[in-house]
Amino acid sequence: MSMFLDTAKISVQAGRGGDGMVAFRREKYVPNGGPWGGDGGKGGSVIFRVDEGLRTLMDFRYNRKFKAKSGEKGMTKGMHGRGAEDLIVFVPQGTTVRDAETGKVITDLVEHGQEVVIAKGGRGGRGNIRFATPRNPAPEIAENGEPGEERQLELELKILADVGLVGFPSVGKSTLLSVVSSAKPKIGAYHFTTIVPNLGMVRTKSGDSFAMADLPGLIEGASQGVGLGTQFLRHIERTRVILHVIDMSASEGRDPYEDYVSINNELETYNLRLMERPQIIVANKMDMPEAQENLKAFKKKLAAQYDEFDDLPMIFPISSLAHQGLENLLEATAELLAKTDEFLLYDESDLVDEEAYYGFAEAEKDFEITRDDDATWVLSGEKLERLFVMTNMERDESIMKFARQLRGMGVDEALRERGAKDGDLVRIGKFEFEFVD
């Protein structure tokens, strides 16, 4: 059995920017050489690229951590450190990427060669050549490199198919796919012969072509996990037309109309939007005894569920085994596809908003102040923490610069308003210092 994996959880971490360098020009005949430390190189980003040759997420079963390289440190003579190469991660077509913490959709990768930056590499820290001023012509200040983005991701593969086959097990879905395409799904006279999705390309006599997916059979209660559950129904979400295959011979003792209602209930329970897709009812096994009588009863029950002004779903009697009625079914499917647009997979609320909106709004706080049980003041906030990690705490001038930045952000004043006294401990991350009033 071929291994098929359509979900995965991974972590990605972009590379850190290289540290800037503190250096001075010391050459004969060059008095007052001045600062000469270069900037660090940028960290590598993590980029997802679509590869049409991949069919599953199997590559992510054991390799779950992806980390790009960091940029090189700045060098003397004002030379920049080398930037790190981006890490390219190949994914199959139809991969949806979500943020594991928020559940938001980051991107939907459907085209071969499509690339998306999933985690951006940090910028390189500036060398001391960048901090020279008339007041301080020989600064001993350099920045650390910026940390790269780190994310926990959920990958979900939904195969790209125009048409999806649904129905109870052993109604003939795999046989139908095998006779209308070059696909070779496993076929057997027992339930759940198909345990992974199969995909085949179908070409009609008129020259139209489309992709058809055969999904593992559903049974009543699948939405509650009975049988194989609905774990593979995600693959039908990209389809535009559903072929609902029914065993009209009732060879297993079930009523064909009850089968039809049960499967539609499972589709609706899984995702209401699946019922928006047009359905064609495929009355299979019409070469079997009692199939004609069952089809008449099926049509009568179906008509009773619709108003006289409603359009009934199209019904095509076929026999996959005897190759009967297939041409009409495929031509009708192609015509329905031609006039059916793609369906929206996600609500706007599910998507990560990457657009920028400009207008008057209250500025977000640059920092937050809390107090631990041990009476230590704790500073946090994205901007403040970013400034902190880019500060070289081994150099006094860099520390003094960071203190000025905190003062400029209003941290000192905010601490006083909260009741901080001279000598109180203040913590940023794991770094502690005394508050000086």
UniProtKB/Swiss-Prot annotation:
Residues that, per the record, bind Mg(2+): S174, T194
InterPro entries: G_OBG, GTP-bd, GTP-bd_Obg/CgtA, GTP-bd_prot_GTP1/OBG_C_sf, GTP1-OBG_CS, GTP1_OBG_dom, GTP1_OBG_dom_sf, OBG_GTPase
Description of how the protein assembles with itself and partners: Monomer.
Name this protein carries in UniProt: GTPase Obg
UniProt source species: Streptococcus pyogenes serotype M18 (strain MGAS8232)
Domain OBG-type G: residue ranges: 161-338
Record keyword GTP-binding present: yes
Protein's cellular compartments: Cytoplasm
Record keyword Magnesium present: yes
GO BP annotations listed: ribosome biogenesis
Required cofactor names: Mg(2+)
UniProt entry keywords in alphabetical sequence: Cytoplasm, GTP-binding, Hydrolase, Magnesium, Metal-binding, Nucleotide-binding
